Amino acid sequence: MAAKDVKFGNDARVKMLKGVNVLADAVKVTLGPKGRNVVLDKAYGAPTITKDGVSVAREIELEDKFENMGAQMVKEVASKANDAAGDGTTTATVLAQAIVNEGLKAVAAGMNPMDLKRGIDKAVVAVVEELKAISKPCETSKEIEQVGTISANSDETVGKLIAQAMEKVGKEGVITVEDGTGLDDALDVVEGMQFDRGYLSPYFINKPEAGTVELENPYIILVDKKISNIREILPVLEAVAKAGKPLLIVAEDIEGEALATLVVNTMRGIVKVAAVKAPGFGDRRKAMLQDIAILTAGTVISEEIGMELEKATLEELGQAKRVVITKDNTTIIDGIGDEAQIKARVAQIRQQIEDSTSDYDKEKLQERVAKLAGGVAVIKVGAATEVAMKEKKDRVDDALHATRAAVEEGIVPGGGVALVRAASKVATTLTGDNEEQNVGIKLALRAMEAPLRQIVTNAGEEASVVARNVKDGNGNYGYNAGTEQYGDMLEMGILDPPKVTRSALQFAASIAGLMITTECMITDLPKEEKLDPAAAMGGMGGMGGMM
């Protein structure tokens, strides 16, 4: 086992604090409408330019192992805030730094760290409750746009795009962010249910100019197995041909003779058919087939429940207003499924999301909810260079998470004002069990001014003057660092989702409390490079002639 380097008490805390400050100082320059950029060197390609706090934090690794432990703990704050709310990473880092600095001063002055931590925890719980009390619902498209704009560093076009996307696909819909191909941002909306499976044969195409298959008012048969024998599907084909409607076949696979016969019948115009593979794999495929069945009022033909494809009737087939199939995707528009059944299915999937522990599973389940309940919107980010596109994509991602959080938990005045107001209110009523807890409460409430002060500092103004003026006001009164004006933050469109502010505060206080109560730090001693003796003697080969 490697030898260890151990530091105690103040020696350990001073080193840890140095690491905290290095990381936090790098991250906090990005905060606010006039926050600066940070340039990150990459091993290959151009450097990355970003204003995203968590991206900056992830890049920082310090040489001194004790300092690095402090930096890594604050990095954890930024990551946790990012995971919980998708935004607020810089705010969380600034809060953690402020609480740690204030807390360690109190510890150095001889206060009991455990009582300080209890005081900090009490202050945080009280402020979180106060944030809930002052939040108001985020309902209008204008408010959604304002939240998106603020989170994208005052980029109004991003705010507008997100508001439009939410309007189109609803608050349950999935909104994704992709690289665009031009200079301008664009919004693509897919209505209906789309899945990533295209036509099985190009001979099904009936719109050659667009390279797509379009079926109007088709029947849809859903089969949970491979179809290789045409006899299995012949009865359904005959029934559909009599009804004079097109048919979409969604099956695990269609191969050989069955596919060839379908193609020939389509080309001769005997019956209008298109075939696609079922989306997903394994259990997920079964679940998605069931989703399509509920959306189109059909039944999945599955041997597991004793159904045979040869005996399928028109009653077991789903129907939709229109189906569009491209090389890569199938979109089912306006299925005739019962609204109540669709809602019940959505509720069932939501329950699975709550029970799931895997982020990947949650994402896939959320996609299924969107396909059933709303639709899918894709924001395509445009920029002149790849570096600019990456930076903008980070901002759009943050803005998207912030707007989702706002829809979920409402809005509070932004610009650090909500924390200042909540802290001022709590300061008048909250007391600890002893004097040292009171010190913990006071230092936590004082640290909650840090985001406002940092926003003002980054805007080139005097932080203490602005902080005093904001504290003297009440309600939504605050300072707009973008325009350098005081006024009602909600009216000026400076909004924050309380979920983002709350997550930032809770994670910052949690890690800061652990640091304040640290008394010992242990790390591996650096290994000394020992020279290989054989290698050191390497120059003596020419002495072989000595007697």
Swiss-Prot record:
Its main location: cytoplasm. InterPro entries: Chaperonin_Cpn60_CS, Cpn60/GroEL, Cpn60/GroEL/TCP-1, GroEL-like_apical_dom_sf, GROEL-like_equatorial_sf, TCP-1-like_intermed_sf. Its EC number is 5.6.1.7. The keyword Isomerase applies. ATP binds at residues 30-33, 51, 87-91, 415, 496. Keywords: ATP-binding, Chaperone, Cytoplasm, Isomerase, Nucleotide-binding. CDD domains: GroEL. It comes from the Bacteria. One of its GO terms (biological process) is protein refolding. NCBIfam families: GroEL, PRK00013.1, PRK12849.1, PRK12850.1, PRK12851.1. This is Chaperonin GroEL.
